[in-house]
Amino acid sequence: MTQKLHIKTWGCQMNEYDSSKMADLLNSTHGLELTEIPEEADVLLLNTCSIREKAQEKVFHQLGRWKELKKHKPGLVIGVGGCVASQEGEHIRTRAPYVDIIFGPQTLHRLPEMINQIRGGKSSVVDVSFPEIEKFDRLPEPRAEGPTAFVSIMEGCNKYCSFCVVPYTRGEEVSRPVDDVLFEIAQLAEQGVREVNLLGQNVNAYRGATHDDGICTFAELLRLVAAIDGIDRLRFTTSHPIEFTDDIIDVYRDTPELVSFLHLPVQSGSDRVLSMMKRNHTALEYKSIIRKLRAVRPEIQISSDFIVGFPGETAEDFEQTMNLIAQVNFDMSFSFIYSARPGTPAADMPDDVTEEEKKQRLYVLQQRINNQAAQFSRAMLGTEQRVLVEGPSKKDLMELTGRTETNRIVNFVGTPDMIGKFVDIKITDVFTNSLRGEVVRTEEQMGLRVVQSPQMVINRTRKEDELGVGRYHA
């Protein structure tokens, strides 16, 4: 009888990527098949996030539910991974002794061995170490699930912003070798992936080793990925302003596959608050990056992250943030009320902004950006938008749905052969959370750029072992 695996994932796109790799890995080593129903599972994994307030309590609340399942199924293996696991380590078992495995973001590749140890009679396994990039060397070949895919190109962060736990939970910056990244993307392209989103906590700090002991910059990697035939849309998440160099901006000038949409976190528009956050840039420097980008891509739209109510933030500081929002004209944001993360420098600062004031500032900020986003959507009425078709529409199964470069959902009447391809759509209706349009051009009529086929990339890359790690042939 086939054994089942249930993974519950909280947090960022990196966690989503990690969870997909856990599923592929355990399917290849143990034959575990994913299930959405925890009660069916033989292995339960909780992939955690420590960014938001009360993250630890959320974990123990979920584990309490799973404890009841283990009472009725003694052989059930329960594992906790992700950033809370990295932060709390063995302490998790102090409060939840029924947890069998505790692993960090950098040790998920050791899950098969950990499960074997538990099933072999070991009471628990805890491994929250930071073995650099080793995890990517032990993962199975990627499996495409639709026309879009995430590919992790680096781990960790060296910036040590005063409010952030990432350097402590995911370690410092380590980049994957460029050939490994290209090999994974070429494999995905062979399976029909058309859009790739490059992932990293500070993705534009990428410095990947090359086959000849050189270093590939992030700008160079973007061009290499865009040159793979079939990859006709390229994104990346998340970047830091101090690493957003002119060579990256130049890629926007000459690489049409790179979308006209950028998520570039700023957190605050006040230089005083940015200094307390240890962001190491000013609001003016941030705006300078946006000006340069719009000089080469006038249509580019920008999203960002904001924290309101940071310790010491005054009404004037918040007003400077609102001024920045108006000047940059952000299309969307991920905005949050500040909450102290244990172990970070900001946690020792006096939290002197009232809860009521924090909520009010968040409301004002989100209303402003929502209004700006609505204006962008209305401006799309009557325009042609290139859409990557994802599948049937959730609103009407007789229609298809896809996304624009700016991640807007578009519903339209089409044919099944369009799924997984690009179509040009004339926008005829604008709604709060989606657009509607009519097909004006199919992919066959577009003349998309072909530079090198995925098989060319794969052919010049040899496998170093059976798990799909490759390097260039000289």
Swiss-Prot record:
Cofactor requirement: [4Fe-4S] cluster
Bound cofactor: record note: Binds 2 [4Fe-4S] clusters. One cluster is coordinated with 3 cysteines and an exchangeable S-adenosyl-L-methionine.
Official protein name in the record: tRNA-2-methylthio-N(6)-dimethylallyladenosine synthase
Annotated Gene3D superfamilies: Methylthiotransferase, N-terminal domain (3.40.50.12160), tm_1862 like domain (3.80.30.20)
Organism: Pasteurella multocida (strain Pm70)
Location within or outside the cell: Cytoplasm
Subunit composition and interactions: Monomer.
Domain Radical SAM core: 143-375
Record-listed [4Fe-4S] cluster 1 binding positions: C12, C49, C83
GO-annotated cellular components: cytosol
Residue sites binding [4Fe-4S] cluster 2 per the record: C157, C161, C164
Function: Catalyzes the methylthiolation of N6-(dimethylallyl)adenosine (i(6)A), leading to the formation of 2-methylthio-N6-(dimethylallyl)adenosine (ms(2)i(6)A) at position 37 in tRNAs that read codons beginning with uridine.
This protein's UniProt keywords: 4Fe-4S, Cytoplasm, Iron, Iron-sulfur, Metal-binding, S-adenosyl-L-methionine, Transferase, tRNA processing
HAMAP family assigned to the protein according to its UniProt record, in alphabetical order: tRNA_metthiotr_MiaB
PANTHER family assigned to the protein according to its UniProt record, in alphabetical order: CDK5 REGULATORY SUBUNIT-ASSOCIATED PROTEIN 1 (PTHR43020), MITOCHONDRIAL TRNA METHYLTHIOTRANSFERASE CDK5RAP1 (PTHR43020:SF2)
Keyword Metal-binding: yes
Origin superkingdom: Bacteria
Enzyme Commission number: 2.8.4.3
Residue ranges constituting the MTTase N-terminal domain according to the UniProt record: 3-120
TRAM domain residues: 378-441
InterPro entries: Elp3/MiaA/NifB-like_rSAM, Methylthiotransferase, Methylthiotransferase_CS, Methylthiotransferase_N, Methylthiotransferase_N_sf, MiaB_methiolase, rSAM, rSAM_horseshoe
Molecular function GO labels: 4 iron, 4 sulfur cluster binding; metal ion binding; N6-isopentenyladenosine methylthiotransferase activity
Family statement: Belongs to the methylthiotransferase family. MiaB subfamily.
